[in-house]
From Swiss-Prot:
GO terms for biological process: plasma membrane acetate transport; sodium ion transport. Belongs to the sodium:solute symporter (SSF) (TC 2.A.21) family. PANTHER family: CATION_ACETATE SYMPORTER ACTP, SODIUM/PROLINE SYMPORTER-RELATED. This is Cation/acetate symporter ActP.
Amino acid sequence: MKRVLTALAAALPFAAHAADAISGAVERQPTNWQAIIMFLIFVVFTLGITYWASKRVRSRSDYYTAGGNITGFQNGLAIAGDYMSAASFLGISALVFTSGYDGLIYSLGFLVGWPIILFLIAERLRNLGRYTFADVASYRLKQGPIRILSACGSLVVVALYLIAQMVGAGKLIELLFGLNYHIAVVLVGVLMMMYVLFGGMLATTWVQIIKAVLLLFGASFMAFMVMKHVGFSFNNLFTEAMAVHPKGTAIMSPGGLVQDPISALSLGLGLMFGTAGLPHILMRFFTVSDAREARKSVFYATGFMGYFYILTFIIGFGAIMLVGANPAYKDAAGALIGGNNMAAVHLANAVGGNLFLGFISAVAFATILAVVAGLTLAGASAVSHDLYANVFRKGATEREELKVSKITVLVLGVIAIILGFLFENQNIAFMVGLAFAIAASCNFPIILLSMYWSKLTTRGAMLGGWLGLLTAVVLMILGPTIWVQILGHEKAIFPYEYPALFSISVAFLGIWFFSATDNSAEGNREREQFRAQFIRSQTGFGVQQGRAH
């Protein structure tokens, strides 16, 4: 595969596909001092928030969940900030720029998982858990095996996602700011560690909230200026875009991104169920006081994200008009300077001048910081809370657990920087696709069935969960992205790019079969305990709130 701008596609779920659709060579741009100054303002402000947060982090609850004192509205903004990546902004708008209507269809994949979280997961998750989703999965099952599986699933997802984000950050900053790749990776790693190490969930939450507000403001302004240009008429917008786009009226037709129904279904399932299995997203539901606030969190987050993806559609069509038809934004060969991923950035310059271009570039960097901070905290909690405090050293004090968590943050940060260096010139787009497939095939089935299926047993959850995880990994390796494009084989053993349809099926079937055939005394006891769990999940009786949470 040609060297592509993985900076944005890497941050996009199932980005292997997006990388093909919006590829463009990485070209280091001149140093953008406006962007650097605005980003430094953001860094200074957020480090001030981290210092403020560090004075309020006194307990395990404060560190992992901000004491459970985040409101539903604040948490909704933070979730949106955690989920809306640089790829969502620049990558989706680039897809619209190149493929038109197909870009809108693709962006819907990011939203379809949220109704599942709202109606099936958020309330029960908050009522049953404390710090991580493993608390919920192990509520009536054996603590050790389930927490090990959940922690492994979380850490694999976090590691893959983190590598992709670090490499993407380096490439993106090299492109937008003109900074050296290695400096960019170290900068992201150090800031990430500082936010999480000193400020915990409270600092991470406010970094995500600020990033979400800035991103929504920037995208809203760009969309407003585009619509102003066409007299606030969507008919004029589409007509002018079709008139200047090389594909003409074809940009208004669907069907160009996914070639067969199996791939389309697998991609959709992976996006839908993967979202509901991402550890750094699920962890956010423990930062609110009760199930009602958890539901409100999803409601607000879905609203913010839905609005945002509508804006990216307008921005993409605006870029077709104002950027694609303007020779000033093209190189000697007629291609967009910096690649198609720069479409929204060039549009920022077209509608707001150099100052607004600097603002959008700084927001793109802030976006990456918000995402990696959430990932790091989720990985640290999986090690310190799930593995250390509940498996390897049961009865550990809060102080010991927090110490392990902070050591893990440092280790994760250093590893992320090193892997960012090692994977600089590699095609890492598949990593986020694999992360979503694992989240959908391991984490999601266990969370869902542990809350809803009374006959689930530890044996079924363990065997089915591991089968789902391994199937996702093996099929991804044997598929076209890794087997052909990376390893260089002539033909893929597994013909489909997205394994989720098959790995999710294997996980659910495995959990059902091994639970149904489990006639052990332990399995029967676990089934009997479902009623007490169900009452707790529905009523919240016994849930600790606020600072005692």
